[in-house]
Amino acid sequence: MHFDHPELDRRTLLRAGLGAAAVAVVGSELVRPAAAHAAPGADLDWIISCDEWAARPPADPLSVSAIPTNKIIVHHMAFPNVTDYSEEHAKQLARDCQDLHMDGNGWSDTGQHFTVSRGGHVLEGRHGSLDRLRAGDRQMIAAHCPGENGRAIGIENEGTYVTETPPEELLDSLARLCTTICRQYGLHAHDIFGHWDFRATLCPGAMFYREFPALRRAVFKQLGTKLGDVPARRWPDIWRFVGGPVVQVAQRLLTFRGYTVPVTGVFDAATVAAVQDWQARNGVPVDIDATLTAPTWETLAPELDQKSSGIPVAAAQFMLASKGYAEVTETGEYDHATRTAVKDLQRLHGLPPNGKISTTTWCALVGGVVRQSFHKH
Protein backbone atom coordinates (compact mmCIF):
# COMPACT_ATOMS: atom_id res chain seq x y z
CA MET A 1 0.00 0.00 0.00
CA HIS A 2 1.28 3.46 -0.83
CA PHE A 3 -0.10 6.39 1.13
CA ASP A 4 -0.91 9.18 -1.29
CA HIS A 5 0.00 12.66 -0.12
CA PRO A 6 0.93 16.04 -1.62
CA GLU A 7 4.61 16.57 -2.32
CA LEU A 8 6.57 18.71 0.12
CA ASP A 9 7.92 22.09 -0.92
CA ARG A 10 9.66 23.15 2.26
CA ARG A 11 11.05 22.58 5.63
CA THR A 12 13.60 23.37 8.23
CA LEU A 13 12.61 21.27 11.20
CA LEU A 14 13.75 20.69 14.74
CA ARG A 15 15.17 17.51 16.17
CA ALA A 16 12.88 14.77 17.49
CA GLY A 17 11.53 14.49 21.02
CA LEU A 18 10.68 11.33 22.95
CA GLY A 19 7.54 9.52 21.86
CA ALA A 20 6.29 8.51 25.30
CA ALA A 21 5.58 10.72 28.29
CA ALA A 22 4.97 10.37 31.99
CA VAL A 23 2.00 8.38 33.12
CA ALA A 24 -1.31 9.93 34.10
CA VAL A 25 -4.02 7.50 35.17
CA VAL A 26 -7.59 8.06 34.05
CA GLY A 27 -10.18 5.45 35.01
CA SER A 28 -10.04 2.54 37.40
CA GLU A 29 -10.72 -1.15 37.78
CA LEU A 30 -14.47 -1.47 37.19
CA VAL A 31 -15.97 -4.51 35.50
CA ARG A 32 -18.37 -3.86 32.64
CA PRO A 33 -20.01 -6.22 30.14
CA ALA A 34 -18.24 -6.87 26.85
CA ALA A 35 -19.04 -4.41 24.08
CA ALA A 36 -21.40 -5.62 21.39
CA HIS A 37 -19.19 -4.27 18.60
CA ALA A 38 -16.19 -6.46 19.44
CA ALA A 39 -15.55 -9.44 17.19
CA PRO A 40 -14.98 -12.48 19.44
CA GLY A 41 -12.34 -14.80 18.10
CA ALA A 42 -10.85 -12.14 15.83
CA ASP A 43 -7.64 -13.37 14.23
CA LEU A 44 -4.88 -11.53 16.05
CA ASP A 45 -2.12 -14.11 15.57
CA TRP A 46 -0.17 -11.63 13.44
CA ILE A 47 0.43 -9.50 16.54
CA ILE A 48 3.51 -10.69 18.45
CA SER A 49 2.52 -11.11 22.09
CA CYS A 50 4.52 -10.13 25.17
CA ASP A 51 5.34 -13.79 25.77
CA GLU A 52 6.55 -14.20 22.19
CA TRP A 53 9.02 -11.33 22.43
CA ALA A 54 10.10 -12.37 25.95
CA ALA A 55 8.82 -9.39 27.88
CA ARG A 56 9.76 -8.87 31.50
CA PRO A 57 6.87 -9.15 33.95
CA PRO A 58 5.39 -5.80 35.04
CA ALA A 59 7.01 -4.23 38.08
CA ASP A 60 3.62 -3.43 39.61
CA PRO A 61 0.01 -4.55 39.10
CA LEU A 62 -1.54 -3.05 35.97
CA SER A 63 -5.05 -1.61 35.79
CA VAL A 64 -7.91 -1.82 33.32
CA SER A 65 -9.71 1.41 32.46
CA ALA A 66 -13.31 2.00 33.50
CA ILE A 67 -14.05 4.60 30.83
CA PRO A 68 -14.73 3.97 27.13
CA THR A 69 -11.92 4.00 24.59
CA ASN A 70 -12.58 6.88 22.19
CA LYS A 71 -9.47 7.30 20.08
CA ILE A 72 -6.12 6.02 18.84
CA ILE A 73 -2.99 8.09 19.47
CA VAL A 74 -0.05 7.50 17.14
CA HIS A 75 3.55 8.12 18.22
CA HIS A 76 7.06 7.82 16.87
CA MET A 77 9.59 6.27 19.23
CA ALA A 78 12.40 8.74 18.49
CA PHE A 79 14.61 5.68 17.95
CA PRO A 80 17.04 5.38 15.00
CA ASN A 81 15.66 4.79 11.50
CA VAL A 82 17.27 1.38 11.14
CA THR A 83 17.38 -0.77 8.01
CA ASP A 84 17.05 -4.09 9.83
CA TYR A 85 13.44 -5.03 9.10
CA SER A 86 13.61 -8.55 10.59
CA GLU A 87 11.26 -10.02 13.17
CA GLU A 88 14.17 -10.67 15.51
CA HIS A 89 15.07 -7.00 15.42
CA ALA A 90 11.43 -6.10 16.14
CA LYS A 91 11.46 -8.33 19.22
CA GLN A 92 14.70 -6.76 20.43
CA LEU A 93 13.14 -3.34 19.84
CA ALA A 94 10.24 -4.28 22.11
CA ARG A 95 12.64 -5.43 24.82
CA ASP A 96 14.74 -2.27 24.51
CA CYS A 97 11.65 -0.11 24.74
CA GLN A 98 10.39 -1.94 27.81
CA ASP A 99 13.80 -1.56 29.47
CA LEU A 100 13.78 2.17 28.73
CA HIS A 101 10.29 2.64 30.10
CA MET A 102 10.79 0.52 33.22
CA ASP A 103 14.41 1.27 34.10
CA GLY A 104 14.73 4.77 32.66
CA ASN A 105 11.26 6.21 33.24
CA GLY A 106 10.39 4.15 36.29
CA TRP A 107 7.14 2.87 34.82
CA SER A 108 5.48 -0.43 35.65
CA ASP A 109 5.72 -1.77 32.10
CA THR A 110 5.96 -0.68 28.47
CA GLY A 111 4.08 2.60 28.11
CA GLN A 112 2.19 2.00 24.87
CA HIS A 113 -0.36 -0.67 24.02
CA PHE A 114 1.23 -1.68 20.71
CA THR A 115 4.46 -1.20 18.76
CA VAL A 116 5.06 -1.23 15.00
CA SER A 117 8.61 -1.81 13.75
CA ARG A 118 10.05 -0.25 10.61
CA GLY A 119 9.81 -3.68 9.03
CA GLY A 120 6.07 -3.75 9.67
CA HIS A 121 6.05 -6.20 12.57
CA VAL A 122 3.31 -5.48 15.12
CA LEU A 123 3.96 -6.28 18.77
CA GLU A 124 2.00 -6.09 21.99
CA GLY A 125 3.37 -3.41 24.29
CA ARG A 126 1.84 -3.22 27.76
CA HIS A 127 0.85 -6.60 29.18
CA GLY A 128 -2.85 -7.32 28.76
CA SER A 129 -3.27 -5.09 25.71
CA LEU A 130 -3.75 -7.99 23.32
CA ASP A 131 -6.35 -9.65 25.56
CA ARG A 132 -8.23 -6.36 25.87
CA LEU A 133 -8.08 -5.86 22.11
CA ARG A 134 -9.54 -9.32 21.63
CA ALA A 135 -12.35 -8.47 24.09
CA GLY A 136 -12.73 -4.99 22.65
CA ASP A 137 -14.39 -3.33 25.63
CA ARG A 138 -11.88 -2.13 28.24
CA GLN A 139 -8.32 -1.08 27.53
CA MET A 140 -5.32 -1.30 29.79
CA ILE A 141 -4.45 2.00 31.45
CA ALA A 142 -1.21 2.94 29.75
CA ALA A 143 1.60 5.51 29.98
CA HIS A 144 1.86 6.96 26.48
CA CYS A 145 0.00 10.30 26.78
CA PRO A 146 -0.89 11.92 30.10
CA GLY A 147 -4.61 12.63 30.30
CA GLU A 148 -5.44 10.12 27.58
CA ASN A 149 -3.98 6.94 29.06
CA GLY A 150 -7.35 5.54 30.09
CA ARG A 151 -9.28 6.30 26.92
CA ALA A 152 -6.80 6.18 24.03
CA ILE A 153 -4.99 3.22 22.50
CA GLY A 154 -1.33 4.21 22.12
CA ILE A 155 0.75 2.95 19.20
CA GLU A 156 4.51 3.58 19.13
CA ASN A 157 6.18 3.38 15.72
CA GLU A 158 9.88 2.65 15.46
CA GLY A 159 11.92 5.54 14.09
CA THR A 160 12.13 9.32 14.08
CA TYR A 161 9.97 11.16 11.57
CA VAL A 162 10.65 14.87 11.92
CA THR A 163 12.42 15.06 8.54
CA GLU A 164 11.85 11.55 7.15
CA THR A 165 8.71 9.61 6.20
CA PRO A 166 8.06 6.14 7.68
CA PRO A 167 8.70 3.20 5.34
CA GLU A 168 5.82 1.61 3.48
CA GLU A 169 6.10 -1.59 5.53
CA LEU A 170 5.42 0.35 8.72
CA LEU A 171 2.56 2.35 7.21
CA ASP A 172 0.85 -0.76 5.87
CA SER A 173 0.98 -2.53 9.23
CA LEU A 174 -0.07 0.59 11.11
CA ALA A 175 -3.16 0.86 8.90
CA ARG A 176 -3.98 -2.80 9.53
CA LEU A 177 -3.53 -2.38 13.28
CA CYS A 178 -5.64 0.78 13.41
CA THR A 179 -8.36 -0.95 11.39
CA THR A 180 -8.38 -3.88 13.84
CA ILE A 181 -8.51 -1.56 16.85
CA CYS A 182 -11.39 0.35 15.29
CA ARG A 183 -13.34 -2.85 14.64
CA GLN A 184 -12.77 -4.23 18.12
CA TYR A 185 -13.43 -1.02 20.05
CA GLY A 186 -16.12 0.43 17.81
CA LEU A 187 -13.93 3.34 16.69
CA HIS A 188 -13.59 5.02 13.30
CA ALA A 189 -10.85 6.29 11.02
CA HIS A 190 -11.67 9.83 12.17
CA ASP A 191 -10.71 8.82 15.73
CA ILE A 192 -6.98 8.64 14.89
CA PHE A 193 -4.82 11.44 16.32
CA GLY A 194 -1.17 12.26 16.97
CA HIS A 195 0.61 12.61 20.30
CA TRP A 196 1.20 16.34 19.86
CA ASP A 197 -2.54 16.94 19.56
CA PHE A 198 -2.70 16.37 23.33
CA ARG A 199 0.81 17.10 24.60
CA ALA A 200 3.75 19.47 24.12
CA THR A 201 6.08 17.24 22.09
CA LEU A 202 7.57 16.85 18.62
CA CYS A 203 6.04 13.35 18.47
CA PRO A 204 4.90 11.89 16.06
CA GLY A 205 7.08 14.10 13.85
CA ALA A 206 5.98 16.55 11.17
CA MET A 207 6.69 14.22 8.26
CA PHE A 208 4.78 11.34 9.86
CA TYR A 209 1.89 13.66 10.73
CA ARG A 210 1.54 14.61 7.07
CA GLU A 211 0.78 10.94 6.42
CA PHE A 212 -2.16 10.91 8.82
CA PRO A 213 -4.86 11.94 6.30
CA ALA A 214 -3.71 9.09 4.04
CA LEU A 215 -3.51 6.70 7.02
CA ARG A 216 -7.08 7.55 7.95
CA ARG A 217 -8.23 7.07 4.36
CA ALA A 218 -6.63 3.61 4.30
CA VAL A 219 -8.40 2.66 7.54
CA PHE A 220 -11.65 4.20 6.26
CA LYS A 221 -11.48 2.00 3.16
CA GLN A 222 -10.56 -1.16 5.09
CA LEU A 223 -13.48 -0.60 7.46
CA GLY A 224 -15.86 -0.04 4.56
CA THR A 225 -17.19 3.14 6.16
CA LYS A 226 -19.69 5.21 4.20
CA LEU A 227 -18.74 8.84 3.68
CA GLY A 228 -22.10 9.94 5.03
CA ASP A 229 -21.28 8.29 8.36
CA VAL A 230 -18.24 10.52 8.85
CA PRO A 231 -18.96 13.71 10.84
CA ALA A 232 -18.31 16.97 9.05
CA ARG A 233 -15.67 17.73 11.67
CA ARG A 234 -14.11 15.60 14.41
CA TRP A 235 -12.36 18.09 16.68
CA PRO A 236 -9.60 17.15 19.15
CA ASP A 237 -11.46 16.73 22.45
CA ILE A 238 -8.90 18.43 24.66
CA TRP A 239 -9.89 18.58 28.32
CA ARG A 240 -8.45 19.61 31.66
CA PHE A 241 -6.16 16.57 31.83
CA VAL A 242 -4.06 17.39 28.74
CA GLY A 243 -1.81 20.19 27.50
CA GLY A 244 0.32 21.38 24.62
CA PRO A 245 -0.02 23.51 21.48
CA VAL A 246 -3.72 22.79 20.90
CA VAL A 247 -4.51 23.89 24.44
CA GLN A 248 -2.46 27.02 23.83
CA VAL A 249 -4.47 27.81 20.69
CA ALA A 250 -7.66 27.46 22.72
CA GLN A 251 -6.21 29.81 25.35
CA ARG A 252 -5.34 32.37 22.68
CA LEU A 253 -8.87 32.20 21.28
CA LEU A 254 -10.32 32.60 24.77
CA THR A 255 -8.10 35.65 25.21
CA PHE A 256 -9.46 37.02 21.92
CA ARG A 257 -12.97 36.51 23.31
CA GLY A 258 -12.13 38.61 26.36
CA TYR A 259 -11.01 36.10 28.97
CA THR A 260 -7.90 36.52 31.09
CA VAL A 261 -6.11 33.19 30.94
CA PRO A 262 -2.39 32.35 30.94
CA VAL A 263 -1.32 31.35 27.43
CA THR A 264 0.97 28.52 28.46
CA GLY A 265 -0.46 25.33 26.98
CA VAL A 266 -1.21 24.17 30.53
CA PHE A 267 -4.93 23.47 31.04
CA ASP A 268 -5.09 25.31 34.37
CA ALA A 269 -7.99 26.35 36.59
CA ALA A 270 -8.39 29.70 34.79
CA THR A 271 -8.70 27.89 31.46
CA VAL A 272 -11.24 25.46 32.90
CA ALA A 273 -13.33 28.35 34.21
CA ALA A 274 -13.10 30.27 30.93
CA VAL A 275 -14.11 27.27 28.81
CA GLN A 276 -17.08 26.52 31.02
CA ASP A 277 -18.17 30.16 31.08
CA TRP A 278 -17.92 30.34 27.28
CA GLN A 279 -20.01 27.21 26.99
CA ALA A 280 -22.68 28.60 29.32
CA ARG A 281 -22.83 31.96 27.54
CA ASN A 282 -23.13 30.36 24.10
CA GLY A 283 -25.78 27.77 24.80
CA VAL A 284 -23.28 24.91 24.75
CA PRO A 285 -23.68 22.17 27.38
CA VAL A 286 -21.19 22.92 30.15
CA ASP A 287 -18.74 20.05 30.44
CA ILE A 288 -17.60 19.09 33.92
CA ASP A 289 -14.04 18.55 32.66
CA ALA A 290 -14.08 21.63 30.40
CA THR A 291 -13.84 19.45 27.29
CA LEU A 292 -13.67 21.53 24.13
CA THR A 293 -16.58 19.86 22.39
CA ALA A 294 -17.39 20.52 18.74
CA PRO A 295 -19.90 23.32 19.55
CA THR A 296 -17.31 24.88 21.88
CA TRP A 297 -14.66 25.00 19.15
CA GLU A 298 -17.11 26.14 16.51
CA THR A 299 -18.37 29.11 18.52
CA LEU A 300 -14.87 30.01 19.74
CA ALA A 301 -12.82 30.04 16.51
CA PRO A 302 -13.51 32.99 14.16
CA GLU A 303 -13.22 32.62 10.40
CA LEU A 304 -10.12 34.36 9.03
CA ASP A 305 -8.96 35.71 5.68
CA GLN A 306 -6.29 38.05 4.35
CA LYS A 307 -8.05 41.06 5.91
CA SER A 308 -7.87 39.54 9.39
CA SER A 309 -5.27 40.37 12.01
CA GLY A 310 -4.55 40.16 15.70
CA ILE A 311 -4.77 37.38 18.28
CA PRO A 312 -6.64 34.74 16.22
CA VAL A 313 -4.25 35.14 13.29
CA ALA A 314 -1.29 34.80 15.64
CA ALA A 315 -2.92 31.68 17.11
CA ALA A 316 -3.21 30.15 13.64
CA GLN A 317 0.39 31.08 12.84
CA PHE A 318 1.57 29.50 16.10
CA MET A 319 -0.25 26.27 15.21
CA LEU A 320 1.13 26.23 11.66
CA ALA A 321 4.68 26.77 12.90
CA SER A 322 4.30 23.98 15.46
CA LYS A 323 3.31 21.59 12.66
CA GLY A 324 6.53 22.25 10.76
CA TYR A 325 5.67 25.27 8.61
CA ALA A 326 8.96 26.93 9.50
CA GLU A 327 8.43 29.88 7.16
CA VAL A 328 5.41 31.05 9.18
CA THR A 329 6.11 33.54 11.96
CA GLU A 330 3.76 35.03 14.53
CA THR A 331 3.13 38.48 13.14
CA GLY A 332 -0.61 38.67 13.75
CA GLU A 333 -0.93 39.72 10.11
CA TYR A 334 -2.42 37.39 7.52
CA ASP A 335 0.65 37.52 5.32
CA HIS A 336 1.75 35.60 2.23
CA ALA A 337 3.61 32.91 4.19
CA THR A 338 0.50 32.26 6.27
CA ARG A 339 -1.77 31.99 3.23
CA THR A 340 0.70 29.66 1.50
CA ALA A 341 0.88 27.37 4.54
CA VAL A 342 -2.90 27.36 4.95
CA LYS A 343 -3.32 26.36 1.29
CA ASP A 344 -0.88 23.49 1.74
CA LEU A 345 -2.75 22.33 4.85
CA GLN A 346 -6.05 22.52 2.97
CA ARG A 347 -4.74 20.43 0.08
CA LEU A 348 -3.44 17.84 2.54
CA HIS A 349 -6.93 17.49 4.04
CA GLY A 350 -8.89 17.56 0.79
CA LEU A 351 -10.18 21.10 1.26
CA PRO A 352 -10.38 23.81 -1.43
CA PRO A 353 -7.01 25.63 -1.22
CA ASN A 354 -8.40 29.14 -0.90
CA GLY A 355 -6.07 30.26 1.88
CA LYS A 356 -8.95 31.24 4.18
CA ILE A 357 -9.39 29.72 7.62
CA SER A 358 -13.00 28.61 7.81
CA THR A 359 -14.44 26.57 10.67
CA THR A 360 -13.52 23.41 8.77
CA THR A 361 -9.95 24.59 8.14
CA TRP A 362 -9.64 25.49 11.82
CA CYS A 363 -10.59 21.90 12.65
CA ALA A 364 -7.85 20.48 10.41
CA LEU A 365 -5.37 23.07 11.70
CA VAL A 366 -5.76 22.16 15.38
CA GLY A 367 -5.45 18.44 14.73
CA GLY A 368 -9.03 17.47 13.96
CA VAL A 369 -10.38 15.40 11.10
CA VAL A 370 -12.68 16.70 8.36
CA ARG A 371 -15.01 14.72 6.13
CA GLN A 372 -13.43 16.07 2.94
CA SER A 373 -10.19 14.27 3.77
CA PHE A 374 -11.94 10.96 3.03
CA HIS A 375 -12.96 11.90 -0.51
CA LYS A 376 -11.24 10.03 -3.31
CA HIS A 377 -7.81 11.49 -4.05
Task: For the regions a language model picked out, list residue spans one by one.
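N-terminal secretory signal peptides and thylakoid transit peptides that target proteins
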Residues: 1-24
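Short acidic, glycine/serine/threonine-rich helix-capping segments at coil-helix boundaries
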Residues: 237-298, 305-368, 375-376
